[in-house]
Protein backbone atom coordinates (compact mmCIF):
# COMPACT_ATOMS: atom_id res chain seq x y z
CA UNK A 1 0.00 0.00 0.00
CA UNK A 2 2.74 2.48 0.95
CA UNK A 3 4.57 1.99 -2.37
CA UNK A 4 1.35 2.37 -4.34
CA UNK A 5 0.64 5.52 -2.33
CA UNK A 6 3.96 7.06 -3.30
CA UNK A 7 3.82 6.00 -6.95
CA UNK A 8 0.18 6.89 -7.60
CA UNK A 9 0.46 10.07 -5.58
CA UNK A 10 3.37 11.52 -7.55
CA UNK A 11 3.14 10.22 -11.13
CA UNK A 12 0.80 11.97 -13.59
CA UNK A 13 -0.45 10.86 -17.03
CA UNK A 14 2.31 11.28 -19.59
CA UNK A 15 5.09 11.27 -17.02
CA UNK A 16 8.17 9.18 -17.69
CA UNK A 17 9.46 6.88 -14.95
CA UNK A 18 12.77 5.01 -14.79
CA UNK A 19 12.94 1.80 -12.78
CA UNK A 20 15.16 -1.30 -12.79
CA UNK A 21 15.12 -5.03 -13.38
CA UNK A 22 15.71 -5.54 -9.66
CA UNK A 23 12.19 -4.55 -8.66
CA UNK A 24 9.56 -6.46 -6.71
CA UNK A 25 6.02 -6.69 -8.08
CA UNK A 26 4.91 -4.26 -5.37
CA UNK A 27 6.71 -1.63 -7.46
CA UNK A 28 6.32 -3.15 -10.92
CA UNK A 29 2.57 -3.67 -10.92
CA UNK A 30 1.64 -0.13 -9.83
CA UNK A 31 3.96 1.16 -12.55
CA UNK A 32 2.49 -1.18 -15.16
CA UNK A 33 -1.01 -0.03 -14.20
CA UNK A 34 -0.02 3.61 -14.60
CA UNK A 35 1.37 2.75 -18.01
CA UNK A 36 -1.75 0.85 -19.11
CA UNK A 37 -4.43 3.10 -17.66
CA UNK A 38 -2.89 6.57 -17.46
CA UNK A 39 -0.33 6.73 -20.25
CA UNK A 40 2.79 6.84 -18.13
CA UNK A 41 6.05 6.00 -19.93
CA UNK A 42 8.32 3.37 -18.39
CA UNK A 43 11.99 2.60 -18.93
CA UNK A 44 13.98 -0.09 -17.12
CA UNK A 45 17.67 -0.20 -16.32
CA UNK A 46 18.71 -3.79 -17.12
CA UNK A 47 20.53 -6.10 -14.75
CA UNK A 48 23.32 -8.44 -15.83
CA UNK A 49 23.62 -12.12 -14.92
CA UNK A 50 25.12 -11.22 -11.54
CA UNK A 51 22.29 -8.84 -10.75
CA UNK A 52 24.37 -5.67 -11.21
CA UNK A 53 23.42 -2.55 -13.18
CA UNK A 54 25.37 -0.07 -15.30
CA UNK A 55 24.76 3.31 -13.66
CA UNK A 56 25.36 5.08 -16.97
CA UNK A 57 22.00 3.64 -18.04
CA UNK A 58 20.16 5.99 -15.68
CA UNK A 59 21.62 8.97 -17.52
CA UNK A 60 21.00 7.32 -20.90
CA UNK A 61 17.31 6.76 -20.15
CA UNK A 62 16.54 10.28 -18.92
CA UNK A 63 13.97 12.28 -20.91
CA UNK A 64 12.58 15.82 -20.64
CA UNK A 65 9.40 14.39 -19.06
CA UNK A 66 11.14 12.07 -16.59
CA UNK A 67 9.24 12.56 -13.35
CA UNK A 68 10.97 10.05 -11.11
CA UNK A 69 13.36 7.20 -10.65
CA UNK A 70 11.54 4.49 -8.71
CA UNK A 71 13.87 1.76 -7.53
CA UNK A 72 14.65 -0.68 -4.80
CA UNK A 73 17.50 -0.13 -2.37
CA UNK A 74 18.38 -3.83 -2.68
CA UNK A 75 17.23 -6.84 -4.68
CA UNK A 76 15.12 -9.36 -2.78
CA UNK A 77 16.60 -12.13 -4.94
CA UNK A 78 20.36 -11.52 -5.09
CA UNK A 79 20.86 -8.98 -2.31
CA UNK A 80 22.44 -6.54 -4.77
CA UNK A 81 22.50 -3.07 -3.17
CA UNK A 82 22.06 -0.13 -5.51
CA UNK A 83 24.14 3.03 -5.11
CA UNK A 84 21.19 5.30 -4.41
CA UNK A 85 23.37 8.37 -3.86
CA UNK A 86 24.82 7.99 -7.35
CA UNK A 87 21.38 7.42 -8.87
CA UNK A 88 19.97 10.45 -7.04
CA UNK A 89 22.68 12.77 -8.37
CA UNK A 90 21.73 11.79 -11.92
CA UNK A 91 18.00 12.06 -11.27
CA UNK A 92 18.17 15.42 -9.53
CA UNK A 93 20.35 16.87 -12.28
CA UNK A 94 17.35 16.30 -14.55
CA UNK A 95 14.77 17.53 -12.05
CA UNK A 96 13.46 14.03 -11.32
CA UNK A 97 12.39 12.68 -7.95
CA UNK A 98 13.94 9.63 -6.30
CA UNK A 99 11.47 7.16 -4.80
CA UNK A 100 13.16 4.26 -3.01
CA UNK A 101 11.75 0.92 -1.89
CA UNK A 102 13.69 0.13 1.28
CA UNK A 103 11.79 -3.05 2.14
CA UNK A 104 15.00 -5.10 1.96
CA UNK A 105 17.23 -2.67 3.86
CA UNK A 106 15.26 -0.76 6.49
CA UNK A 107 16.49 -1.90 9.89
CA UNK A 108 19.45 -3.91 8.65
CA UNK A 109 21.31 -1.50 6.38
CA UNK A 110 22.38 2.11 7.10
CA UNK A 111 20.06 4.61 5.39
CA UNK A 112 20.52 8.39 5.39
CA UNK A 113 17.83 10.01 3.25
CA UNK A 114 19.56 13.39 3.11
CA UNK A 115 23.01 12.05 2.27
CA UNK A 116 21.66 9.56 -0.25
CA UNK A 117 19.39 12.12 -1.92
CA UNK A 118 16.16 10.20 -1.34
CA UNK A 119 12.94 12.18 -1.81
CA UNK A 120 10.50 9.46 -0.78
CA UNK A 121 11.45 6.33 1.18
CA UNK A 122 8.99 3.44 1.39
CA UNK A 123 9.46 0.61 3.86
CA UNK A 124 7.71 -2.44 5.23
CA UNK A 125 7.75 -3.25 8.92
CA UNK A 126 7.93 -7.04 8.93
CA UNK A 127 11.34 -7.63 7.34
CA UNK A 128 14.55 -5.98 8.57
CA UNK A 129 12.62 -3.80 10.99
CA UNK A 130 11.43 -7.00 12.76
CA UNK A 131 7.90 -5.66 13.24
CA UNK A 132 4.50 -7.29 12.67
CA UNK A 133 3.10 -8.06 9.24
CA UNK A 134 0.72 -5.47 7.90
CA UNK A 135 2.89 -2.52 8.91
CA UNK A 136 4.88 -0.12 6.79
CA UNK A 137 5.30 3.53 6.04
CA UNK A 138 6.59 6.39 3.92
CA UNK A 139 9.23 8.98 4.79
CA UNK A 140 8.71 12.11 2.67
CA UNK A 141 11.20 14.90 2.12
CA UNK A 142 9.87 18.27 3.21
CA UNK A 143 8.17 20.14 0.41
CA UNK A 144 7.02 17.11 -1.58
CA UNK A 145 3.25 16.84 -1.90
CA UNK A 146 1.82 13.35 -2.40
CA UNK A 147 -1.79 13.03 -3.52
CA UNK A 148 -3.72 10.73 -1.17
CA UNK A 149 -4.24 7.29 -2.66
CA UNK A 150 -7.37 6.89 -0.54
CA UNK A 151 -9.53 9.31 1.43
CA UNK A 152 -12.10 8.83 4.16
CA UNK A 153 -12.34 8.99 7.91
CA UNK A 154 -9.55 10.91 9.59
CA UNK A 155 -10.77 11.74 13.09
CA UNK A 156 -10.10 15.43 12.48
CA UNK A 157 -11.73 18.16 10.33
CA UNK A 158 -14.86 16.01 10.19
CA UNK A 159 -17.03 18.79 8.72
CA UNK A 160 -14.74 19.27 5.73
CA UNK A 161 -15.79 17.72 2.41
CA UNK A 162 -12.15 17.08 1.57
CA UNK A 163 -9.57 14.93 3.28
CA UNK A 164 -7.08 16.83 5.49
CA UNK A 165 -4.03 18.05 3.60
CA UNK A 166 -1.57 17.98 6.50
CA UNK A 167 0.94 15.17 6.93
CA UNK A 168 0.63 12.48 8.14
CA UNK A 169 -3.19 12.60 8.18
CA UNK A 170 -3.40 13.18 4.42
CA UNK A 171 -2.04 9.66 3.85
CA UNK A 172 -3.75 7.91 6.76
CA UNK A 173 -7.44 7.52 5.91
CA UNK A 174 -9.41 5.05 8.00
CA UNK A 175 -8.63 3.23 11.21
CA UNK A 176 -4.94 2.57 11.61
CA UNK A 177 -3.36 -0.72 12.66
CA UNK A 178 -2.75 0.33 16.24
CA UNK A 179 -1.54 -3.06 17.44
CA UNK A 180 0.84 -3.33 14.50
CA UNK A 181 2.15 0.19 15.03
CA UNK A 182 2.84 -0.58 18.69
CA UNK A 183 4.73 -3.72 17.70
CA UNK A 184 6.70 -1.85 15.05
CA UNK A 185 7.57 0.81 17.60
CA UNK A 186 8.93 -1.80 19.98
CA UNK A 187 10.96 -3.37 17.19
CA UNK A 188 12.34 0.01 16.13
CA UNK A 189 13.37 0.67 19.74
CA UNK A 190 15.30 -2.61 19.79
CA UNK A 191 17.03 -1.79 16.50
CA UNK A 192 17.92 1.69 17.71
CA UNK A 193 19.44 0.29 20.91
CA UNK A 194 21.26 -2.55 19.13
CA UNK A 195 22.49 -0.43 16.22
CA UNK A 196 21.81 -0.95 12.53
CA UNK A 197 25.53 -1.29 11.86
CA UNK A 198 25.82 -4.11 14.42
CA UNK A 199 22.82 -5.90 12.95
CA UNK A 200 24.23 -5.54 9.44
CA UNK A 201 27.65 -6.82 10.49
CA UNK A 202 26.28 -9.95 12.14
CA UNK A 203 23.87 -10.78 9.32
CA UNK A 204 26.60 -10.25 6.74
CA UNK A 205 28.94 -12.56 8.65
CA UNK A 206 26.31 -15.32 8.71
CA UNK A 207 25.53 -14.83 5.01
CA UNK A 208 29.19 -15.11 4.02
CA UNK A 209 29.65 -18.18 6.22
CA UNK A 210 26.80 -19.88 4.35
CA UNK A 211 28.07 -18.75 0.94
CA UNK A 212 31.59 -20.02 1.61
CA UNK A 213 30.09 -23.32 2.67
CA UNK A 214 27.90 -23.93 -0.39
CA UNK A 215 29.66 -22.20 -3.29
CA UNK A 216 31.86 -25.18 -4.19
CA UNK A 217 29.34 -27.96 -3.63
CA UNK A 218 28.94 -29.93 -6.85
CA UNK A 219 25.53 -29.38 -8.39
CA UNK A 220 24.86 -26.12 -6.54
CA UNK A 221 24.47 -22.85 -8.47
CA UNK A 222 24.60 -19.64 -6.43
CA UNK A 223 23.27 -16.35 -7.83
CA UNK A 224 24.54 -12.82 -7.25
CA UNK A 225 27.79 -10.90 -6.92
CA UNK A 226 29.60 -11.76 -3.69
CA UNK A 227 32.56 -9.49 -4.43
CA UNK A 228 30.45 -6.53 -3.27
CA UNK A 229 28.69 -5.75 -0.03
CA UNK A 230 25.13 -7.07 -0.18
CA UNK A 231 22.19 -7.87 2.02
CA UNK A 232 22.08 -11.11 3.98
CA UNK A 233 20.37 -13.38 1.47
CA UNK A 234 21.66 -16.17 -0.77
CA UNK A 235 19.66 -17.57 -3.70
CA UNK A 236 20.65 -20.90 -5.19
CA UNK A 237 19.51 -23.95 -7.11
CA UNK A 238 20.48 -27.58 -6.68
CA UNK A 239 21.10 -29.45 -9.93
CA UNK A 240 17.91 -29.37 -12.00
CA UNK A 241 15.61 -29.85 -9.02
CA UNK A 242 12.44 -27.78 -8.84
CA UNK A 243 12.96 -25.01 -6.30
CA UNK A 244 9.70 -25.75 -4.52
CA UNK A 245 10.71 -29.36 -3.98
CA UNK A 246 14.08 -28.32 -2.56
CA UNK A 247 12.40 -25.86 -0.21
CA UNK A 248 9.94 -28.55 0.90
CA UNK A 249 12.74 -31.02 1.64
CA UNK A 250 14.64 -28.38 3.60
CA UNK A 251 11.54 -27.67 5.66
CA UNK A 252 10.36 -31.22 6.27
CA UNK A 253 13.72 -32.92 6.57
CA UNK A 254 15.82 -30.26 8.28
CA UNK A 255 13.47 -27.69 9.78
CA UNK A 256 14.91 -24.95 7.56
CA UNK A 257 12.55 -22.30 6.17
CA UNK A 258 13.41 -20.92 2.73
CA UNK A 259 11.56 -19.10 -0.04
CA UNK A 260 11.36 -20.87 -3.42
CA UNK A 261 9.90 -19.80 -6.75
CA UNK A 262 9.86 -16.41 -8.42
CA UNK A 263 10.01 -14.15 -5.33
CA UNK A 264 7.70 -11.60 -6.99
CA UNK A 265 10.78 -10.53 -8.99
CA UNK A 266 10.06 -11.60 -12.58
CA UNK A 267 12.45 -9.23 -14.34
CA UNK A 268 15.35 -10.22 -12.10
CA UNK A 269 14.75 -13.92 -12.67
CA UNK A 270 14.77 -13.29 -16.43
CA UNK A 271 18.08 -11.43 -16.08
CA UNK A 272 19.59 -14.32 -14.12
CA UNK A 273 18.21 -16.94 -16.51
CA UNK A 274 16.10 -18.56 -13.79
CA UNK A 275 12.63 -17.56 -14.99
CA UNK A 276 11.65 -21.16 -15.72
CA UNK A 277 13.08 -22.81 -12.61
CA UNK A 278 12.98 -20.11 -9.94
CA UNK A 279 15.43 -20.31 -7.04
CA UNK A 280 15.67 -21.17 -3.36
CA UNK A 281 16.38 -18.14 -1.19
CA UNK A 282 18.04 -18.37 2.21
CA UNK A 283 17.61 -15.29 4.41
CA UNK A 284 19.81 -14.73 7.45
CA UNK A 285 18.68 -12.92 10.57
CA UNK A 286 20.30 -11.24 13.54
CA UNK A 287 18.87 -14.09 15.61
CA UNK A 288 20.42 -16.91 13.58
CA UNK A 289 23.48 -18.71 14.92
CA UNK A 290 26.62 -20.05 13.29
CA UNK A 291 25.49 -23.56 14.23
CA UNK A 292 22.28 -23.05 12.26
CA UNK A 293 24.27 -21.81 9.28
CA UNK A 294 26.50 -24.88 9.36
CA UNK A 295 23.45 -27.14 9.54
CA UNK A 296 22.00 -25.38 6.49
CA UNK A 297 25.24 -25.96 4.59
CA UNK A 298 25.15 -29.65 5.49
CA UNK A 299 21.53 -29.87 4.35
CA UNK A 300 22.34 -28.36 0.96
CA UNK A 301 25.30 -30.72 0.56
CA UNK A 302 23.15 -33.76 1.33
CA UNK A 303 20.41 -32.72 -1.08
CA UNK A 304 23.00 -32.13 -3.81
CA UNK A 305 24.41 -35.68 -3.61
What are these regions (language model features)?
Residues 3-305:
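Pyridoxal 5′-phosphate
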